[in-house]
A protein has these predicted regions:
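N-terminal catalytic or cofactor-binding beta/alpha core of small enzyme domains
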Residues: 1-144, 155-160, 164-168, 186-196, ...
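An accessory alpha-helical subdomain
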Residues: 171, 175-180
Length: 230
């Protein structure tokens, strides 16, 4: 019998200026919802400490469990809409983490690519959020802090899982706006339902990917992940 799909949902703990991270609350709200479409899926919630020295822990989790899809949540206090990040860049800003420590260098992975595009169709997901009444947009700038760094690490792991398949597992980062993480005109419940829709879409994409044998290419009906030049 085939193993159930493994899905990872991540959020962040507190960091300087944000004592209660809204992404953590949103992730908990999301997983409290009943979702018949993913009732057979094994979902892991990981609250990531907002620390540069904790990134190896994320790597270890990704490499050990080999997730079929990853949904990462983070907070962006200055944004007004839910932002779906189309890429992660291999660069960091010299800003202290929750422990007061600074990043070890100016690049996340010194020998890595300059940028990696999301392996999920972010633009299509933005459209679905808007249809649900959520203020949402696509973004090419996930920042140069730990949100972007975690995204880059998750995308590197996903590309390492591609093996003989044409596509890597879907990985998507969502930035939640403002201090509350809830966009104007939306309730916490409404946001949780919208994030649930994203999760269901990622699961569907993972099912299609796993149904393809080695070397089989994407169906013409499969949305192509958004390309994002470096």
């Amino acid at each position: 019998m085939a193993r159930p799909l493994r899905i990872l949902v991540t959020a962040f703990g507190p960091f300087p200026g944000v004592p209660l991270n809204p992404s953590q609350r949103a992730a908990i709200d999301l997983l409290r919802l009943r979702r018949p479409a993913v009732s057979d899926v094994e979902i892991t919630l990981e609250i990531l400490p907002t620390r540069w020295d904790e990134l190896p822990r994320l790597d270890a989790l990704l490499n050990r469990r080999r997730f079929d899809a990853v949904l990462l949540l983070g907070a962006a206090a200055r944004r007004q809409q839910v932002c779906l990040e189309t890429r992660a860049v291999n660069a960091v800003r010299d800003f202290p983490d929750a422990a007061g420590r600074h990043p070890p260098g100016r690049r996340i992975m010194p020998q890595g690519l300059d940028a990696l595009a999301s392996t999920a169709p972010a633009l299509a997901r933005v459209a679905s959020l808007r249809r649900a009444g959520i203020m949402a947009s696509a973004s090419r700038d996930a920042g140069r802090y730990l949100c972007n760094a975690a995204y880059f690490h998750a995308l590197v792991a996903a590309h390492g899982q591609a093996w003989g398949k044409d596509v890597a597992p879907p990985v998507l980062f969502v930035h939640l706006p403002g201090r509350s993480g809830v966009p104007r005109g939306t309730s916490r419940t409404g946001l949780a339902r919208a994030l649930s829709g994203l999760l269901v879409a990622l699961v569907a994409q993972a099912r299609r990917r796993n149904a393809c044998g080695p070397g089989l290419r994407r169906s013409a009906r499969e949305p192509r992940p958004d390309t994002a030049p470096a």
